[in-house]
UniProtKB/Swiss-Prot annotation:
One of its GO terms (cellular component) is extracellular region. The gene is Tac4. Disulfide bonds: none annotated. It is found in: Secreted. GO terms for molecular function: receptor ligand activity; signaling receptor binding; substance K receptor binding; substance P receptor binding. One of its GO terms (biological process) is positive regulation of cytosolic calcium ion concentration. It comes from Mus musculus (Mouse). PANTHER family: TACHYKININ (PTHR11250), TACHYKININ-4 (PTHR11250:SF2). The keyword Signal applies. Keywords: Amidation, Cleavage on pair of basic residues, Hypotensive agent, Mast cell degranulation, Secreted, Signal. This is Tachykinin-4. Residues 96-128 are annotated as: Disordered.
Length: 128
């Protein structure tokens, strides 16, 4: 129905103009004005989507398919903002979980000894 309406809008004015003035068919600026039809009021989703895809660059099309960008934002940037500047170290969390599982209630690990030594070390200040 919609393509038929667009075709009717394109052909209608040209048929009316040529039927009234068969003698004067000049291809100038005036002749082109009756051929132009404004279709801004009629949205066609499939045409709009194809135009948007054509306007995007090749890299944006590729990364859109691969899921690298979501809604114009890069996923890495969002994750980095959420986690802070250090990020998340999977290796470190796995090691900590494994050492906590192996440690007995009374056992002392090397990391805990180092942190205790740092906490108990006296702070030296100088008055100059």
């Amino acid at each position: 129905m919609l393509p038929l309406l667009a075709l009717l809008l394109l052909i209608g004015p040209s048929v009316c103009t040529t039927a009234g003035d068969r003698e004067e068919l000049a291809f100038g600026a005036e002749a082109e004005s009756w051929v132009t039809v404004n279709l801004k009021g009629i949205p066609v989703p499939s045409i709009e989507l194809k135009l948007q895809e054509l306007k995007r660059s090749r890299t944006r099309q590729f990364y859109g398919l691969m899921g690298k960008r979501v809604g114009g934002y890069q996923l890495g940037r969002i994750v980095q903002d959420l986690l802070g500047t250090r990020g998340l170290s999977i290796e470190g969390t796995c090691r900590q979980a494994a050492s906590q599982q192996r440690a007995r209630p009374g056992a002392v690990t090397r990391e805990s000894l180092q942190s205790r030594e740092e906490d108990e070390a006296p702070l030296t200040t100088s008055n100059v």
